[in-house]
């Protein structure tokens, strides 16, 4: 695990150095201009996003309401322009789990620092003359967690689609993907006495998930925003299939020296979650340096 963290640290330091050096070669834009461009999901601006999530849980299990988790994630986005208004996106999502509850025969246990399950999407986005944006691609999730109790049971893969509309005041949109399990042993069933919020995914999973989002531009590079993510697990037990939050927050684009940085804080409240155990409150803080593209 220490080797994984060291490797990730080296990669992040290299990316940060690239960001600072490349930034000097770009004609500077105002923070307000950058904020409006970043509201466009088909933007050609590169970002190195670090979402930090703190989640509090609830449910029918004993002590469920005393559980919490914390993670630091990394999601780079360096769009590749293919033609005017058309871009290719390759976006990995790498979670580092600082604390995460699991449930077994002895009740809840907190797991320490671990690499989580990495996911990624590859998609092509197009901006139409009507300022409508469509993005179509594929999503995949991988069982990479270094703790077996946090590791999903199989690789999942499937299509994704996003539709958004740009306005003078901001943007709204929604993304949906569906992932099927494509690996794992169907005879290797999970222990009924074991429960992990990280997965709770049966063999050969079938999960529909997505995100709805909105951005309202304000003065001085401030924005009202929300980007909650939801999921529907088709093969979970009744009462444990749907997870859905409502959320809102703020963005602020500012500059540290010559480096623009997008700062975000959001609160999500889960109006639907698995009955035994699921998220109830979530605070997301995100730090996202804005970087020039290397191509």
What are the functions of these language-model segments?
Residues 1-35, 295:
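Cleavable N-terminal export/targeting peptides
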Residues 24-295:
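Transmembrane beta-barrel domains of Gram-negative outer membranes and organellar outer membranes
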